[in-house]
Structure formats: C-alpha cells, structure tokens
C-alpha cells in the first residue's frame, strides 16, 4: 500500500492506540491458541523474499495509516474494527464454525472467478491454497480478533477474512504480508462479492455446521435415556398429572418418553438446518449482482457445493434473500424448542430425585459435589440445574434474534452480527449442556424400585382401573374414603364386597397396571 508522507498528529495517536490494542489482543489470542497452531504455521511457511524481521508493517485505508504487527495475517481493516468494537471481549477466534464458513465462501469465489477467467490462475491457486491452510491445516484460526458484536452488517469480519486469506496467499507466492499490489484483499480475495452476500452465506454455513454438532449431542443424549428406559422397563410407579397421583406406569416408559421427546427435536433441527442451504451468494450489495461476471451466481454456488459437500442452492429472489433473516429466526426457534424440551426433562429429573427422605425419591442422580456450606450431607441436583439455566439463556437469545430480525430496513438487515452471536452461543452452550447432562447425570441414574412400588400400592389413583366394574360414582366414594381414612383401596373394595378377590387382584396386578389391555380382556370375558 502507498504511504502518506504528511501524517497528522491525530493519525499518529490513532496508530499508537491501535498498536496497544493489537498487542493486547494478540497476547490474548496467543495464550488461547497454544503452541499447536504456531508449530503448524512454522512448518508450512514459504520463505518470503525479504527475511529481515520487523516489528511492524504499515498499511493504510480510507482513514489513513496504521502499524500492523509484522506477524499478524490480518490487516488495517481488522485493526480498525478491534479499536472500534471493544464490547464483549469475545472474539470471532472463539467461533471456528463461522471462520470456516467465511473461508469456504472465499475459496468458492476464487474457483468461480477462475473458471470465468476474471481471476488469473496464479492468484486463484494462491487463494485456494490459503483457504485450505485454514480449512484443512487449521492455520490462522487465531487471526480473527474482532469482537462478535460489531456494526456494519458484518463488514469487519468480511474484511478480516479477506486480509487473512490474502496474506496467506502472499506467503504462498513468496511475498511479504501486506504486499497487496501483488494480491489484494478486496480486488482479488473479495472479487465478485460484497459483505452483503459473502457474510450471510458464511454465516449460514457456520450455523449449519453448529446445528450438526448439536443434533449429534442430542442424539447421544436420547440414546442414553433410551438405555435407561430399557433398564427400568419392569419398575412400576405412579404417573402424575398436575403433581397429583394419576395412574400407574413403568419408570421405563417415563424415560423412553424423554428419549422420544429428544428424537423429535432432532427432526425439527434437521429441517431448520436444511433451510440454511439456500444462499444469496452472487447477490453482492443488494441483490442485483452488481460487479459480477455473467454466469457467476450459478458458478459460485456450484463451487461452494463442491467445497462444502452440501447441496446448496441459489435463492430464487436475491433481493429478497439479501434483506431477509427469516431462516435465522426459524433456526433459533428450533434451538429454543429443543432447549424447552430439555429444560422440562431436567425439571422432571429434579422432582423424581427430590428428597431423599421428604421428597419423591423415585430415582437417584449421581452425586457430583457437596450441596451446602451449612447443611451437612446435603447433595443437590447440580447437573439438571445448570442445564435449566443454559436453557433459560437460550430463551433470551431467541428474543434477541427475533428483535434483530425485525429491525432490518429496506434492502439489508445490519443486525446480523448480534443474530450470529446469539445463534452461535445458543448452539455452543446447549450442545455442551446436553453432553454434560448425559455424561454426568443420565448414565449414572439409578432407580428406587421399592419406593416406586410402595407409591403404587398406597395410591388412590388405581381406583381408575375399577371404573368398568364399579362406575365413576362408586369410584369417587371409595377414593374419598381411602383419602380420609388412609386405608388402601383394595381393602375397602373387599370389605364392601364390591368385587370378588380374584377379579380385584387380576385388575390390580402389576401386569394389568403396567399393561391395561389385560383389563380389556377381562371385561370382555365377563
């Protein structure tokens, strides 16, 4: 880039401030990324023409010059964003699926531009190599130091991606970082693109990948519940509605219902993920495809399908697709729904394990830590509790996504970054919560079969099974007397000679209580 000789004092101050910010950000990134990425980088670096080590390089943009750390693969636009958006201190470095999605877009664009002869072969080869360094070798995953909250509809991340890919490509060509007259972040890496089509497409790919991870975690969790259902299949217990005794069931049925609940959510999440495979790549600024060569729209989507292995398709109306964020609302709604089901299951686990002496105590959750600083021997259901809290956070994120989607204006929704922050966070924490619940709770659950059976034997709810023999009114009277006197239903029925003992025992047998079809056969025989 060309240097400005008469830099103002204001620019000098900005340089100093940016330098401080970058030094701090890079120290954080270095500490977090550990040594594996650094080793991979050192092994694959192509020696540049100049080997003299400098602490900084100078890059300039519309606003002037900035000093960029010489080791950094990002450039001046990224540094501006780091300075401007010090909001959450959570950076794109922590969202690898998003980084990969953006880089996949850059690779597909290079392939399409080469096939249409708008990008020279050598540049295309260098860009593709650079993208593969990130996608396959996982290099430079720590070179995205911008905050997840950012203005500009994602321009900062798009610029960041362009710069990292460009500087890696320059390395491939044997040039120094920042020698953009050889290969330019915008003119070459961003060729035939706008932030307004590359960013949402990369976003969709990242969310799609995150959904696959969440679906896999939910699948493992539902399998764990199913195994417990099989383990508890012969344990009879009372079912409850409105926290009152209802009719008997098996503990296995209760746990299999948890599994079926989660399996249903997998289907919903897959459908939501598939909606993300319609992209607006080729739309550029507002959907008209300005500055793209003829045929680019279909070429680039085909190339992106090759790069990702996904069946992507171009949106029917690119202007509509560029401004619409409905697919994100739908995706997060599916995530919220899964969180709602998971939270309800955790509520049930906490209730069923309550006690142990003054609660239901039908199941035992694995003890994970001491529960009180003042009450000895107390153990709390900390795993279901933390999952509940994660689900509440997902519910809040869903409202954020809804409000941000509604806030779009005319041909673009500039609020996509906060939609992305909410979606990626929900995917990450809900997936972690599902894994935690499975590993630290569900697989270790045991049943208190005697407690479960005692509740059934002492229940008034079993009177429901006698309706075909006694009628509802007599059942009411027996149930009321049992509640008032504390006497068992069986005893009152026999005392009043309302049924013979053989029939009563058959109807109230464990077989019939767990499989009520038996009662139907008995009724027909009579």
UniProtKB/Swiss-Prot annotation:
Underlying gene? aspA
Q: Which reaction does it catalyse?
A: L-aspartate = fumarate + NH4(+)
What's this protein's name?
Aspartate ammonia-lyase
What segments bear the compositional bias annotation Basic and acidic residues? Answer: 10-20
Q: Source taxonomy lineage? A: Bacteria, Bacillati, Actinomycetota, Actinomycetes, Mycobacteriales
Q: Which family does it belong to?
A: Belongs to the class-II fumarase/aspartase family. Aspartase subfamily.
- Oligomeric form and interacting partners: Homotetramer.
EC number per UniProt: 4.3.1.1
A GO BP term here is: tricarboxylic acid cycle
What does this protein do, in the record's words? Answer: Catalyzes the reversible conversion of L-aspartate to fumarate and ammonia.
Return one GO MF term.
aspartate ammonia-lyase activity
The species is Corynebacterium glutamicum (strain ATCC 13032 / DSM 20300 / JCM 1318 / BCRC 11384 / CCUG 27702 / LMG 3730 / NBRC 12168 / NCIMB 10025 / NRRL B-2784 / 534)
Q: Which InterPro entries match?
A: ApsA (IPR004708), Aspartate_Ammonia-Lyase (IPR051546), Fumarase/histidase_N (IPR024083), Fumarase_C_C (IPR018951), Fumarate_lyase_CS (IPR020557), Fumarate_lyase_fam (IPR000362), Fumarate_lyase_N (IPR022761), L-Aspartase-like (IPR008948)
State the residue spans of region: Disordered.
Answer: 1-44
């Amino acid at each position: 880039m060309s240097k400005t000789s008469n830099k103002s004092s204001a620019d000098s101050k900005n340089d100093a401030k940016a330098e401080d910010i970058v030094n701090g950000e890079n120290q954080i990134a270095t500490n977090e990324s550990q040594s594996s990425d650094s080793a991979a980088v050192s092994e694959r670096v192509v020696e540049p023409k100049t080997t003299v080590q400098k602490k900084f390089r100078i890059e300039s943009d519309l606003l002037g010059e900035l000093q960029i750390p010489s080791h950094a693969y990002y450039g001046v636009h990224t540094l501006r964003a780091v300075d401007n958006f010090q909001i959450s201190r959570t950076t794109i470095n922590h969202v690898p699926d998003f980084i990969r999605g953006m880089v996949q877009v850059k690779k597909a664009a290079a392939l399409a531009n080469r096939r249409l002869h708008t990008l020279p072969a050598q540049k295309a080869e260098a860009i593709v190599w650079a993208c593969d360094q990130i996608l396959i070798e996982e290099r430079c995953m720590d070179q995205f130091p911008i905050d997840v909250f950012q203005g500009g509809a994602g321009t900062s991340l798009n610029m960041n991606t362009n710069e990292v890919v460009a500087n890696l490509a320059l390395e491939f060509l044997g040039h120094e970082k920042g020698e953009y007259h050889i290969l330019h972040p915008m003119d070459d890496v961003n060729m035939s693109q706008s932030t307004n089509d590359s960013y949402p497409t990369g976003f969709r790919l990242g969310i799609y990948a995150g959904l696959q991870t969440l679906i896999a975690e939910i699948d493992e969790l539902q399998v764990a519940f199913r195994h417990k259902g099989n383990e508890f299949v012969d344990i009879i217990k009372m079912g409850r509605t409105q926290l009152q005794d209802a009719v008997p069931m098996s503990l296995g049925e209760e746990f299999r219902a948890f599994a079926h609940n989660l399996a249903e959510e997998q289907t919903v999440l897959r459908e939501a993920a598939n909606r993300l495979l319609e992209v607006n790549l080729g739309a550029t600024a507002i959907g008209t495809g300005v500055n793209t060569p003829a045929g680019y729209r279909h070429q680039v989507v085909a190339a992106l399908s090759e790069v990702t292995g996904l069946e992507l398709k171009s949106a029917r109306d690119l202007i509509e697709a560029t401004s619409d964020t409905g697919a994100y609302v739908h995706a997060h709604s599916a995530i919220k729904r899964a969180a709602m089901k998971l939270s309800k299951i955790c509520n049930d686990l906490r209730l069923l394990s309550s006690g142990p002496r003054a609660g239901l105590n039908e199941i035992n959750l694995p003890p994970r830590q001491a529960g009180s600083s003042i009450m000895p021997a107390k153990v709390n259901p900390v795993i279901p509790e933390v999952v509940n809290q994660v689900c509440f956070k997902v519910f809040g994120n869903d409202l954020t996504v809804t409000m941000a989607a509604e806030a779009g204006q005319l041909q673009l929704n500039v609020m996509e970054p906060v939609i992305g922050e909410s979606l990626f966070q929900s995917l990450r924490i809900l997936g972690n919560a599902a894994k935690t619940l499975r590993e630290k709770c569900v697989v270790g659950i045991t049943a208190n079969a005697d407690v479960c059976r005692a509740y059934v034997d002492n229940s008034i709810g079993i009177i429901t099974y006698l309706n075909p023999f006694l009628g509802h009114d007599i059942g009411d009277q027996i149930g009321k007397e049992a509640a008032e006197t504390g006497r068992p239903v069986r005893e009152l029925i026999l005392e009043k000679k309302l049924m013979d003992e053989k029939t009563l025992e058959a109807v109230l047998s464990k077989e019939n209580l767990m499989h009520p079809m038996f009662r139907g056969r008995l009724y027909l025989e009579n």
